[in-house]
């Protein structure tokens, strides 16, 4: 398996896990058990009004990955690149998607 395939698997696995866990993220076990049975959640359920919805955690994971990729490209082209700053800028772009006033 190539590095790119492993990276894609990590991103997909994170998103799928987030979508499975989002409906129960802030619930206590007795509430989860009452809604989904003793086995807990085992299939996609509604979160934020959407079945299989991802949360802000997956959104930020993807924006962080985009920042890492952008930093890699900048570094590969021998441009000055401060990786934390590039990732910070990527996360600021995420913040603007959350109806937050632009800080970029």
Outline where the language-model segments fall:
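Structured, active/binding-site neighborhoods that engage oxygen-rich ligands
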Residues: 1-104
């Amino acid at each position: 398996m190539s590095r790119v395939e492993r990276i894609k698997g990590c991103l997909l696995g994170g998103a799928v896990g987030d979508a499975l866990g989002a409906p129960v993220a802030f619930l206590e076990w007795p509430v989860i058990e009452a809604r989904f049975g003793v086995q807990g959640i085992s299939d996609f359920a509604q979160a934020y009004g959407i079945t299989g919805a991802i949360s802000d955690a997956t959104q930020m994971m993807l924006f962080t990955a985009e920042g890492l990729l952008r930093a890699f490209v900048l570094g590969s082209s021998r441009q000055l690149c401060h990786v934390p700053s590039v990732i910070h800028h990527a996360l600021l772009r995420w913040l603007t998607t959350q109806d937050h006033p632009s800080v970029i």
